[in-house]
Amino acid sequence: MLEHCHGEKTHFSRNEKEQILSPYRSFCVNFARPPHPSAWGTPIINRRMNDEYKTIDGIGQGVYTEKRSKFLAYAHPVDSVEQIKDLLAAYRKQHYDARHVCYAYMLGPERQEFRANDDGEPSSTAGKPILGQINSHELTNILVVVVRYYGGVNLGTGGLIVAYRTAAALAIDNAPMVSRLVEETVSFAFPYVMMNGVMRVVKESEARILATNFENTCEIKLSIVRSKAEELRNKLNKLSFG
């Protein structure tokens, strides 16, 4: 189940739970991953080396109207739960007269931190469809908020799901999408006589130099795509025994 910020919980069927866990059973060997929400949209293609992730690079907006109810959707790039809380507070203040401010978010290159919130709508009719759109676009580091202004006519469970899903999709589609690299930091200390060898390895590995210190003991801090980090460490360590 998902536990909402307001104490609300979203329950999933046994079949949904099986789908959530299934993408990782094929290649989890040395470590365990948390349940994945791929059952709520198009399944995510598993990548052994997670060097890239998809996110949005700006705000997207969408509006959907059904039976006089208006759904205003906003997609935001985010990096932390703290930032999400600030944005939610701002939207609740801006739309103080709205009936519901529902949302879902996904965080982290591995898409391991996520939450959905129905904000008083019937269980699983708002937050879950919003999260499904985030997942079907394979996005992370994103918050989607859908504000509902009630039009006086009940939409029913099916109507609510369609409305929140459609509004979320419109906001996401109107946001600029980008792919970003997942990088890891590698630090190495060495005597000055090893300088040429170290710089040769850095160049061959296509690592980025973040910082250097060439005083008594030389130190270098590098950034490299995650899949090449261990290989870089091994090459640098071998220089010490060369």
Task: Give the role of each language-model region.
Residues 177-192:
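Short glycine-/aliphatic-rich beta-strand segments at the starts of folded cytosolic domains
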Residues 189-207:
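Short amphipathic alpha-helix segments
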Residues 95-98, 205-210, 237-242:
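A common structural junction motif
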Residues 222-231:
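Terminal, non-globular segments
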